[in-house]
Curated annotation (Swiss-Prot):
Mg(2+) 1 binds at residues 90, 113, 115. Belongs to the FBPase class 1 family. InterPro entries: FBPase_C_dom, FBPase_class-1, FBPase_N, FBPtase, Fructose_bisphosphatase_AS. NCBIfam families: PRK09293.1-1. One of its GO terms (biological process) is fructose 6-phosphate metabolic process. This is Fructose-1,6-bisphosphatase class 1. It comes from the Bacteria. HAMAP family: FBPase_class1 (MF_01855). One of its GO terms (cellular component) is cytosol. It comes from Haemophilus ducreyi (strain 35000HP / ATCC 700724).
Length: 334
């Protein structure tokens, strides 16, 4: 049995020039995940953390009380160790430059969706936390700048998510494969349960909100019909599975094989998911697990961000299925 802490130390030992900052950040995320896990597990017993907060985030989306709690928990956990120079979140209007001397001398910045799928909390459906870590490009010792956050996804040094469901799991990559750790509440430890995770090249599930079908571009409509057609050779029709939480849908497809799609639409002309907080970290994980992630035309990780809350159409999952979806997008243009 190997714990997350032991795994981090073991991997750090493989890089003697490393000073442990990245390990410290992962330890902060581990702590935040435990705290968020605790609050989610008692959500049905406490009205203090259930329901709407009465505020909106920068995208105009109504914030849940747990959105704000998870966001503040991540900030506090990172500030306590001073291994991060700056922080950006889906829930905040602007990035935050941590301004202690040690923070200014830190090499990394972190971006997060602190509680993905939070609208599901009140009905006891699984949710998640997503995180993404980059090396800063501004001078060490100075406050971070917007350019530190607007880096292509390929420059990520680590990314991962925590899924809070029937069990709580932390899944992450540092660019050398994907590993999953299951939380044992009796021990208070994350235990390595899914080493070297690989996404099946082909899958049998497609995940998309078909209730918005009429708003989708033609290529997506054609691909949905393709998924529903009978074809013994390709083992179609595929099964539709859509939870409404990116982390939950991706996690199932990572284990079982499948594709998750959140395309452009007449309601969301640029797509709905955020490139920096959702797209890039999940795309990094997918590629490290032999999967694929695109906007229907190009790899997500190759997109140069232009703003903190930039939206992007999103196709992610088993490589064969994403390639098929890309073909439909590129063939059936409007």
């Amino acid at each position: 049995m190997k714990t997350l802490g032991e795994f981090i130390i073991e991997k750090q030992a493989e890089y003697p020039e490393a000073k442990g900052e990245l390990s410290g950040i992962l330890a902060s995320i581990r702590l935040a995940a435990k705290i968020i896990h605790r609050e989610i597990n008692r959500a049905g017993l406490s009205q203090d953390i259930l329901g709407f907060a009465g505020s909106e985030n920068v995208q105009g989306e109504t914030q849940m009380k747990l959105d704000i709690f998870a966001n503040e928990t991540m900030k506090k956990a990172l500030l306590a160790r001073e291994d991060v120079a700056g922080f950006a979140s889906e829930e905040d209007d602007n990035f935050i430059a941590f301004d202690s001397e040690r923070n200014r001398n830190a090499k990394y910045i972190l971006m997060t969706d602190p509680l993905d799928g939070s609208s599901n909390i009140d009905v006891n459906v699984s949710v998640g936390t997503i995180f993404s870590i980059y090396k800063r490009i501004s001078p060490i010792g100075s406050p971070v700048t917007i350019e530190d956050f607007l880096q292509e996804g390929r420059k990520q040094v680590a990314a991962g998510y925590v899924t809070y469901g029937s069990s709580t799991m932390l899944v992450y990559t540092t660019g050398n494969g994907v590993n999953g750790f299951t939380y044992d509440p009796s021990l208070g430890l994350f235990i390595l349960s899914h080493p070297d995770m690989k996404m099946p090249a082909e899958g049998k599930y497609y995940s998309i909100n078909e209730g918005q079908y009429v708003t989708f571009p033609l290529g997506v409509k054609k691909f949905i019909k393709y998924c529903q057609e009978n074809d013994e050779a390709s083992k179609r029709p595929y099964s539709s599975r859509y939870i409404g939480s990116l982390v939950s849908d991706f996690h199932r497809n990572l284990l079982k094989g499948g594709i998750y799609i959140y395309p452009t639409s007449t309601v969301y002309p640029q797509g709905k998911l955020r490139l920096l907080y959702e797209g890039n970290p999940m795309a990094f994980l997918a590629e490290q697990a032999d999967g694929m992630a695109t906007d229907g035309f190009q790899p997500i990780l190759d997109i140069k961000p232009t703003e903190l809350h930039q939206r992007v159409p999103f196709f992610i999952g088993s490589k064969t299925m994403v390639k098929q979806a890309n073909t439909f997008m590129q063939t059936f243009t409007e």
